[in-house]
Amino acid sequence: MGVFVKMATDSFNVGELALYRGLFAVVVLGVWVLCSHHSFATKHLKEHLLRSLCGTISFLLWFVSLTLIPLSTAMTLGNATPLCMAAIVVIYGLVKKRPTSLVLVCSAIAGFGGVLMIFSPDTNVNLVGAAFALGSSLVTAGSYIQIKALSRLKEPVWRTVFYFSIVNVILGAMLDFCLPETSLETSVGWRDILSLLGMGACGLAAQLCVTRAFDRSNMLVSTILSYSVIVFGILFGFIFFGDAIDLWMVAGTAVIIVTGVISTMSVKKLEEDPDSLL
């Protein structure tokens, strides 16, 4: 999806990207629900709205980062969510005066050390774009916590993704209205249309898969496999956009992946604690 978003940023603003991304999913899921006679109704609207707001804000931040930094960097920093979750759990433990895993603390610190390696002067990273990508990871951590909460409430995966997509459309349209320039003022070609369709299809498939994975509680396996996105991001960035592969970038990415896996293993142990944030 990141490749299609990166391609579309030349012709569409961030609001439009969020709008079209959500619209594709709303149409596809809406038709499926009507044909299969499922119900859109839910008893947990507040939980859906909170998850959808976190998810949409996360994507908006990530879309902005893609306009400022290379795809590989945006993928790496945008997938530092386990480190952000570790930081949240550590802070939560300190506030509640509860014992915190030393492994979790060390892995979080080391992971953010990997982030600093990516910020090395040799990598020439746009700090504003990197900040947006990291902000996306932080908000995504909150979104994942809400997905877990919805799974405990036995909400179906498709309904979680459907409400998320509706909020995509609403916030995207509002942001597009506030931004001065839209795609309607520029020439939109087949390449742009195909980019939007690719973004929508990949985005819908990814959301269904991620939500299903967390719904089945395979948090550790899901997180480890999700790091393959970073590898693909580096390769696709090099192939499609000519992004340079820097030694500091590779080293920092490796540190983030390793510490992210360790953080996830530590966080996984906390899920059994009834007083845990997770």
Residue ranges and their predicted role:
Residues M1-F12, L17-Y20, L60-L71, L77-A80, ...:
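Juxtamembrane C-cap of transmembrane helices in multi-pass membrane transport proteins
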Residues A74-A80, E155-V167, L204-F238:
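Helix-helix packing/entry segments at the starts of transmembrane helices
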Residues I88, T100-S120, W248-V267:
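Hydrophobic transmembrane alpha-helices of multi-pass small-molecule transport proteins
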Residues Y227-L278:
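C-terminal-most transmembrane helix of multi-pass membrane proteins
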Residues S11-I57, M85-I88, V139-S143, Y163-P180, ...:
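Transmembrane alpha-helices of multi-pass small-molecule transport proteins
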Residues P82-V103, V231-V250:
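C-terminal transmembrane-helix exit sites in multi-pass transporters
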Residues V3-K6, L29, D122-E181, L277-L278:
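Transmembrane alpha-helical segments that form core, pore/gating elements
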Residues H38-F63, V103, V128-S136, D176, ...:
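Loop-to-transmembrane-helix transition segments
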